[in-house]
Amino acid sequence: MRRRFKYPAVLAVLIIVLSISACGDKSEETGNDSDKAWADRYVALIQSGEARDYEDYDNMKKELDRVKEESGATYAYILSPMADGKPALDGDPSKDFAITVDAGAEPDDWGVTYEWEIQFKEAWDGDPATARSAWDDSEELQCWSAFAPVYDSEDNVVCILGIDYPCTDVIADYPEWNRDHPEWNGYETEITGEIPAAVQTQINEVKTLADKYAKELSAK
């Protein structure tokens, strides 16, 4: 009798083992997006076409919330170039960019366009870049903006991180570096004049922060 039931018993064991293996493979295949690099999850977000209804959006936003809090920025956000009127992975960086993931307390709508500025394209082309001047966030608060590229696991720039950083104390002494001030020097693309040391330090600081956190979001 033992010989009679030997092979069915072995077969049963094999079936159990194969079933467990199959379940394991399925788990690995489906995976959890939170285990992936933020940049690769961003690719999936854009490709989904679901905007902020995408199932992983809230988790992705939480990581930008962390960037905002840790850096001391007043605002942290993601911009993408546009194609066919919506944010894209391969849009034209010489035209307007659109906001996507937004860490603001009162976020802009998905896809709201930001009028093109040279620092957007510079960041998209792979170099951290800053605005050429500060601006008024409010009457009491001035900010300087910086942008840096975010790379996916295939080494593609898939978006740019933007941060707005408070600089009121510095700009109070150099109002000509505030584009919203009557004494603004007018620099929008190339800076041809001398940059005061304090202003240069501010520029370097915000650029370094944008680059640091963009690298944390990247898959590189």
Identify the meaning behind each predicted range:
Residues 28-59, 191-200, 205-220:
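Extracellular/periplasmic ligand-binding regions of membrane signal-transduction receptors
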Residues 19-22:
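C-terminal motif of bacterial Sec signal peptides marking the signal peptidase cleavage site
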Residues 65-86, 181-220:
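Short N-terminal helix-loop-first-beta-strand/juxtamembrane motif that initiates sensory/input modules
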Residues 24-26:
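Bacterial signal peptide processing site
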Residues 94-136:
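Extracytoplasmic/periplasmic sensor domains and loops in membrane signaling proteins
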